[in-house]
Structures are given as structure tokens and as C-alpha cells.
Amino acid sequence: MARRPVDIPIPASPVQPFPILTEYVDIVAGFGRGSAELGIPTANVPIEQLPSEVNEMATGVYFGWARLRPNMDQEAQVHHRNDGSEVIYNFGSKLSETERGVFPIVLSVGWNPFYNNSKKTVELHILNDFEEDFYGAKIKFSFLGYIRPELNYTTKEALIEDIHTDIKIASEVLHTEPYSSLKNQL
């Protein structure tokens, strides 16, 4: 795969501080831009629920593995975003057995300068097509490596193009050993 000048060389196996594993954390509603504006849905997680070293990590794009599970202690609820739109939290009750497997992910840790965010976020794009949204479900995931630093973009199209390149890089790396077998940690 052709590398971009900003891409960080990915080692043959994870090097410190990787792998970083999380416990199960909540999936929360973000700004609604991933699916609606970019066509790239993301699962947003509260950074304060993650291991402390995540907040100290360089901003940018990472890759790893993730596993979803329903949060069956909850009943469906309607949540309101800051923009007034409504999101149904079904707490993962509609996840099929297959959708509870382990999937490759691309993660963004940062401020999303294209959107001028004022709060650092962690957003995961899970490389799988899901039948339903799963706000409120639980997700456990790993950080296995770093693809590139966070960038600002002049156009939405350039951002989308780079995200698609990130997805290709992550998919390629995660299908090689030892990265592939690290999905068993989840």
C-alpha cells in the first residue's frame, strides 16, 4: 500500500506502549457527523472511562480490535444531542450474536480540528456493517499501533479520503501476525 508522508512506520509487532487494552466502556452519542456527514459511522466512548495513558497519548489515528456486548440492565431511552436531534439508546439490545464478535477498528484520539471541537474525543470506526445502531452498548477494545498524527483539513472530501486510507492500512496490518492473533485478548 502506498504510504502518505504523514504516516508513521508500523512495526512488525506492537511496541511499547502497545498493546493498550480497555475494560468494557459505554458507547455514547457523539455529534452525529460520522454517519450523517462522512458516511463513516463511529462509536464514541468517554475518555474518562479509558485507561489513564490514553489521555496522554499523541492525538491521531490508531488501530486495534474491539468487541461489543449489550448493556441489558437498561431499557431503551431517547437522548438529546446538543443540536436538539434525538438518539435512541437501545443499549445494544438489537446486536446479533455475530455482531458481538471481535472486529478490526480504526480509532481517532483528538480534537477533530476540522470541526473545531473543544473537547478531546475517542471515536472508533468498527470495520463491520451493523444492522442497527447500538448507543448505550458496552465496548472493549485495544490500541495496537499508531497510523498517523491528527490533521486539519480544508475540505470534507480530503478528510473522508484520509479516513478511507486509514481503514485500508489498519485492515492490512491487522490481518498479519502477530496483530491478527491479538484479537484473542478480547
Swiss-Prot record:
The active site is at E123 (nucleophile). Transmembrane segments: none annotated. Keywords: ATP-binding, Flavoprotein, FMN, Kinase, Magnesium, Metal-binding, Nucleotide-binding, Transferase, Zinc. Zinc or magnesium. Pathway: Cofactor biosynthesis; FMN biosynthesis; FMN from riboflavin (ATP route): step 1/1. It catalyses: riboflavin + ATP = FMN + ADP + H(+). This is Riboflavin kinase. It comes from Eremothecium gossypii (strain ATCC 10895 / CBS 109.51 / FGSC 9923 / NRRL Y-1056) (Yeast). The lineage of its organism: Eukaryota, Fungi, Dikarya, Ascomycota, Saccharomycotina.
